[in-house]
Amino acid sequence: MKNRKPIVIIGAGPAGMGAAIEAARAGASCILIDEGRFPGGQVYRKNSKEFQVKEKEMLTAEQKRGKKLHEELEEVSDKIKILTSTSVLGVWKNREVMWSSNDASGVIEAEQIIIATGAYERPVPFPGWTLPGVMTVGGVKSFIKTMFIKPGETALIAGTGPLLISTANKLHDIGVNVLAVLEAGSPSWASPDFINQWGDADFAHDIAADLLELKQNNIPILFNHTVFKINGKDEAESVTYGALNPENWKPLEDTTKTVNADLVALGFGFVPNTELTELAECKHEFYPGIGWTVIRDEWMQTSQQGIFAVGDGARISGAIIAEEEGRIAGIKAAQNCEAIQAVDAEKRSEKYFSRIHSFEKFRKHLNEVTSVKSGLLELATHKTLVCRCEEVRLSDVDKAITEGAGDLQSVKLLTRLGMGACQGKNCSPSMGMYLCEKLNKTAYQVGRINPRPPVKPVTLGALANMTITKDSHQNDSYDAINTGGYYEK
Amino acid sequence: MKNNEVIIIGGGVIGCAVAYYVAKKGINVMLIDQPKRGRATSASAGGLWPLGESIGLGCGVIFHKAMIEKGLLPADSHIPPQLPKSFLDFAIQSNEMFPSLTGAIKELSGIDFEYEETSLLFLMYDDADVAFAKTLYGNCPCGNSRIDWLTPFEVKHSEPAITHNILGALRFNGDNQVNPYALADGYREAARKLGATIITHTEVTGIKINAGRVSGVETKAGFFPSKYVVNAAGAWAAQVGEMAGVEIPVYPVRGQIIGTEAMPKILSACISTNDCYIAQKHHGEIIIGSTTEETGFNTDITPSAINSLCKGAVRAIPFLEKAKVKRVWSGLRPGTADELPILGKVKGVEGYINACGHFRTGILNSPLTGLLISEMINEDQLSFPIEPFLLSEERLQSLTNNENSNHKTSIQ
Amino acid sequence: MKTSEKDLRINKGVIRGKEIEIIVDGESVKAFEGESVAAALFANGQRISRSTTKENSLRGMYCGIGMCFECVMTIDNIPNTRTCQTFVREGMFIETQQAEGKWKTV
């Protein structure tokens, strides 16, 4: 094999781990980069190595899958350069990857890039959503899982999708008083028929098990309900909730009740983290209620040659499909590097393709039942902060619209919406939808808030100390980066 | 609908300034704008450096050093080309308009464009810088009444955050700064208060000409009649000129720029070195610029530019090492080969007026440009001789054939 | 050492890293190696990380995955440090951040 530049895999969650495992098995040179201290991503996140955790006798299906994936990665870890505690600041379409770690930064020229940056919770602004004590369900779940700390005493959980249920159970397990789960929809996954219909999909079993547990835990689930307002002076103290119109999820104002709770966990589905695919100028498409996704071919290749996008960072499908997508991309990238032949690639990827195809119908179904409806936007009042970083209120956005702003970029220029540290992640999905509704425009017309490098925080000192690696086999500047020691033998 | 006498194409700082000054004369004016990615106003540091810019500081000196490093200029040519006296006079007169402008704009629009009297410091790192500074100190076109030579001790005393590894600094008094976005917003809102019509998010598709005279502007939102059309389209001025059959030798020159997170006040002056310039803005963020690159309408940012600007910033202010970069972005300056703006009427098309080609000094030169254009339209006596900036046939020829243009070479 | 009336740590099934002390707004607070700064503070009942620049409103950890920048505090004199992504160290100096925070500039 020729002396090739490496395959760079960005993100070490299920998709990135799957990609790295397959690329390494195929004999390709590869670098796996993750911001965290260890591989695992959000769903298969590992505990701090300083902690000794007694493994439960009965692992959940999800824990079993995570364990297996970690074992597989460990088996090939001597063939992969794993850069943990390392952020990717930008990706260019000529396949340059800019990274930073502590006080250093660098540019790697990659042969192939696999972007596996995962997803984050879709923001839905409403009064009080910025108070301390209000967290995302994913944040709550991983916080408990890795830190073993109660994030509050009395919790209310709201949003849409099966993650609400597993989070409720998890909180109950550790002794938090969970008042209720408020599900904005009336999804089919919550019906008893669901397991009969989708029984062959792993994920359906997980949901059924979680629902059963919820029932045993005596946690009520209210359908077509959500949080209207969170009250409190310094932190969340009480929650006003109510019913939604099942058709469009518009809040029904005369249905409200208020309960005391110091923890509110919110999860209105997920948004793919497409910053890097946007920077690389890959093509994206929009699905109403779901959002922007990366356009890919069956091998997970984006519209930019040599750049792949896999897992929830490309399109929300959950951890199981993410892993299969990652594996397929890892195999194809190895083939593109001439580490393996096309026939071999076909053979290696066969079972992953067949798994994905068997999930396809289920995935479409799940997309339908985890999408959000625009009535939720009416939860925000004029005074509600819609951009948490720059403290932009809905009334500021309305004023910009009056002044002629017809797309997100123009609203940004007039209001500073999306100009803060999170680069618009917490306002762009909701305000994109808002502009579409208000101006009767398509998501393509409304556009997006363009991400700008660096997409992760980095010091000037680190950028001043930048190594531009032309030939990755010489002077690997990233040799010094701490790999977290997780797989060190 | 009232009849517009004047339509301005372009809503950057120049277009907005022209709208303000024309509206101030009581003339019916409309501004049509389509915000474009890469507009220079949004990638400006907001420096008002009439002296610095005229003698090649700011971006000039950075570009000059890069040219030497690439072997495109002899190593001993430590003096960036100075611009003609007429440019310096123009810039100084425009700069002097800011103190009164700040009150006028605030009163009309409520917008404070954060005018700050900072002065500009040129840091001398080595003997070559000292030699350069000596030349400037001795030969400044306005004499050295506005320049102070500071010893390292004096620099340390007035700007403790600046590195102690310097041989001295030149202070240019009267070189100040504003917030460039607020300035453009301020002009625009003040113009609106004075009766100007502002149409945003609207693409101009043509300029209508009848018998050699402008009769209006075609847009995606319909036709708007007018007697005068002002081309204030920045880096896109050539395309707008073409709509009127006028050749405008303006081309985009990319500048990449870095903004930090908001910091406490650590700088009272703006800084120019041969690596970068540095300005701390009112909100606390520090702006570090800038490259000079001819890459067409490409607004990409590049790792090597980020690296060299960060190196330059940390060298000048070591403490910045710990500061976080919030964003890197780029803008397209409306470049001209002789680095002078293109102003005024052209032969052959009655009613067409240029207000373009401001290159690196659009913010600084916006008030005088706006005033002159308004005087031209109102047929008043002009406050400044416009001849050096007209697009005469000779100038057009020299601009289009100019082999000496610095910027024809792309430097990253 | 400041002893909070509540310690929200779950001790069943887990042995934490070494116990250390961190300094939070001038007071000594118990923490364990392997905990994020946000976790150590939450365990001690402190969920407020900062107050905002424009409206002086209070914020705390929201996303928990390093994406929202709500949990930033001033750590060892560096403002805007994400507490959910930063791990405790003996003697770490942590301050509730007001607006842009205070830098030690010279």
What residues fall within each predicted segment?
Chain B
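Dinucleotide-binding Rossmann-like beta1-alpha1 core, especially the glycine-rich loop
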Residues: 47-154, 313-314
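Active-site substrate-recognition segment that forms the wall
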Residues: 17-24, 34, 44-53, 60-80, ...
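Helical element adjacent to the flavin cofactor pocket in flavoenzyme catalytic cores
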Residues: 169-228
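N-terminal Rossmann-like FAD-binding beta1-loop-alpha1 element of flavoenzymes
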Residues: 4-31
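C-terminal catalytic lobe of FAD-dependent flavoproteins
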Residues: 317-412
